[in-house]
Amino acid sequence: MPREIITLQVGQCGNQIGTEFWGRLIAEHGIGPDGIVKEFATEGTDRKDVFFYQADDQHYIPRALLIDLEPRVINSLQESEFKNLWNPENVYIDSQGGGAGNNWAVGYTHATEKYEHIMDMIDREDNSDSLEGFVLTHSIAGGTGSGFGSHMLEQLTDRYPKKIIQTYSVFPNDSERSSVVVHPYNSVLALKRLILNADAVVVIDNTSLHRIADERLQLDFASFKETNSIISTVMAASTTTLRYPGYMNNDLVGLIASLVPTPRAHFLMTSFTPLVIKGAQRRIQKTSVLDVMRRLLQPKNIMVSCGTKKGVYVSILDIIRGDVDPTDIHKSLQRIREKKIVNFIPWGPASIQVALSKQSPYANVPYRVSGCMMANHSNLGNLFARIIRTYDILRKRNAFLNVYKETPVFSENLDEFEDAKETITNLIEEYKAIQTSDYINWGMKQQQSQISQKESSSLANENGNGANNKPGKSAMAL
């Protein structure tokens, strides 16, 4: 039985990515823009029901919520060729339409005011036979995707504690390209929720997206549509085994379990090859299994700008699509081991996992074999350290804090900033510890320390001193 997934598209970036994603999915499942299955695709063995459900007239509707605080992007979707694809009851645009002003706290406050309405939308969508979890698409740099998305993560954790929460989170540029001057504040506040409330976070780094567009696709300056097309390619590829199941990784739990051996270090990097999008120059290349698997490991193809030559891989999953002989997989893995291309953790299994999946029979692709890598790497901690450094630059100058102090979240103090920084700093330390052979002992000591802190907090409450305690890290009181 298919395990259903509800997609939550939040903010401008989240909705633009989501639209590209659904465009790929309907092409791969032989569904038209109106949700009607094309005649040649009626007898397929693919699992459409994972991401779609059928209306009474048999047309397919995405299991998706479209959420934004300003109307421009969603209105454009409702006027596009996909206007009849969405369920109009699953669209939320703030009645005032003013947006969040690139302010995490404004987005978060809006969500606290509207969360019952949003949760009712999700509860109504949760009419599936076997809901497995949620996929959130958003940016952490702006106001709606970061702030509204943060509150949704907290509420989903509270209301659906046994469901998987995976995100595709776009991280800001670390260069002059970033147009949101307060993105370090927004990123730190959103990243705290991604650490505490998500089961897996696929990191999409804008810096790497533009580099890939410049170098691999030879686009002088990639548009949002082109970078979003790259992201949607990875999203579609990473969900292939859920929609075209094989022998392994047929559900979200299995997919994440193979990549996230420890609860907090659940951030993932990706790569895809061969990468082909509209508007970009095509390069004819060899697509043997070995060639694809080696290209997936090349730093220039990885969509996070933290490097992989130093540090270690915690886990790697290669999803290979096409008409592939399993013996080619074994030979390719052996060649990669012989050349010592990959450095793994010293305290766990050192192997690349491979999942095979069919190409969609309905979508024309210009290559015989394609691959998507999802990997957990210790150098992701460097990305978070970079965010903390940019945050510290603003925070030491107390720059732009007035717009945050005007919101209920920060009306009394700025403690939430420091709490978020502490949460991220702890994760950075964990990624450093992951590289050592003593990581398991380190983790046990950290766990014991947390237990001791909880016991001390409980004792303080019993003595009547609990009134000064701050709210728990997984939720925040207003």
From Swiss-Prot:
Q: Which SMART domains match?
A: Tubulin, Tubulin_C
Q: Specify the superkingdom.
A: Eukaryota
Q: Name one GO cellular component term.
A: cytoplasm
| Residue ranges, annotated region (Disordered) | 451-478
Question: Chief localization class?
Answer: cytoplasm
Q: Name one GO molecular function term.
A: GTP binding
The Gene Ontology biological process annotation of the record reads: cytoplasmic microtubule organization; microtubule nucleation
User: Which PANTHER family does the record cross-reference, listed alphabetically?
Assistant: TUBULIN
Name of the protein in question: Tubulin gamma chain
- Species of origin reads Reticulomyxa filosa
